[in-house]
């Protein structure tokens, strides 16, 4: 590897603010904020959505049936092309 061209890879804390969950993982993201976690200071980044708060992963997503969508379309625009 060439010296001086690669970003600084380090442990960073990501905070999902909507679920109040902290993730400590490796990243090259740049930030000026820090947080102390378990006695160690880490770079700190806030995020809005993670697997702890996204409806797909939490099982709270809404299911839409295709039949309902088709029927709704036909009801609105079915006579338009006749």
From Swiss-Prot:
One of its GO terms (biological process) is translation. Coiled coil: none annotated. The keyword Ribonucleoprotein applies. One of its GO terms (cellular component) is ribonucleoprotein complex. One of its GO terms (molecular function) is structural constituent of ribosome. It comes from the Bacteria. Pfam families: Ribosomal_L31. Signal peptide: none annotated. Transmembrane segments: none annotated. Keywords: Ribonucleoprotein, Ribosomal protein. Belongs to the bacterial ribosomal protein bL31 family. Type B subfamily. Part of the 50S ribosomal subunit. NCBIfam families: L31 (TIGR00105), PRK01678.1 (NF002462). This is Large ribosomal subunit protein bL31B. It comes from Pectobacterium carotovorum subsp. carotovorum (strain PC1). The gene is rpmE2.
